[in-house]
Design a protein with these regions (language model features):
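Short, positively charged and aromatic/hydrophobic N-terminal segments
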Residues: 13-14, 23, 29-48
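Zn2+-dependent cytidine deaminase-like catalytic core
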Residues: 10
Length: 215
């Protein structure tokens, strides 16, 4: 409808032409040009969206690769010693990491030389470890590093797939968020997990601990 109105405003004299055939031919040709122009604009926008989505998915993969590389190196050094940890202990570790990020954001300096980025990587890895512990349970004897890495890959892939689906639905709105907002959001999630743990998982409407770890 807005195309018809625009054409009528642009070419008001068309309605006064005696040759009706020429009038309508010119009129609808104008509409055709207008629609074609809009379709080209839409195609360009759609192409940009697809390109951005592909770029975002690759960025997700690059970050997970970086996290996995560090996780694998620590498996070499320490083994899968984290398999001994109960989920509540992992929640506390996540809390400490997130609190340190917020502290650094506020103070604008670190006295121990480690910045915010390593802590975000640690949050990702501990989150995956938490999901593993929820599913497999904690143990007294650690698993082999190969088995631990297989479990890591399984849940890292699930997290990637969830992020991709959410990115589709939210149309990359997260890119407009401040990093400090992510920190607060993560702390909120961790606090929810602590509350759920305190009531032994007996929730009424809330998502479980695993969903919060995945987020």
């Amino acid at each position: 409808m807005f195309l018809l109105l625009r054409c009528s405003v642009t070419y008001p004299k068309l309605l006064q032409i005696e040759d009706n055939t020429k009038c309508f031919a010119t009129y609808f040709y104008t509409i055709y040009l207008a629609i074609s122009s809009e379709m080209l604009k839409f195609a360009a926008i759609f192409e940009n969206i697809m390109a951005d989505s592909a770029k975002t998915e690759q960025q997700f993969k690059d970050v997970l690769t970086e996290c996995r590389t560090l996780f694998q190196k620590k498996l070499h050094d320490y083994g899968a010693s984290w398999r001994i940890l109960r989920p509540s202990s992992l929640t506390d570790q996540l809390y400490i990491k997130a609190k340190r990020i917020r502290s650094l954001e506020i103070k604008k300096e670190s006295l121990v030389g480690e910045g915010i980025r390593p802590e975000f990587i640690a949050l990702i890895n501990y989150g995956i470890v938490g999901i593993i512990q929820l599913e497999k349970g904690y143990v007294d004897e650690v698993d082999t590093s190969d088995e631990a890495l297989q479990l890591y890959d399984k849940y890292a892939l699930e997290a990637l797939q969830l992020m991709t689906r959410k990115n589709h639905d939210y149309d990359e709105a997260w890119r407009s968020m401040r990093v400090s907002s992510y920190t607060d959001f993560i702390l909120t999630k961790i606090q929810r997990v602590k509350e759920i743990e305190d009531i032994q998982g007996d929730t009424l409407v809330s998502e479980g601990i695993d969903a919060n770890y995945m987020d």
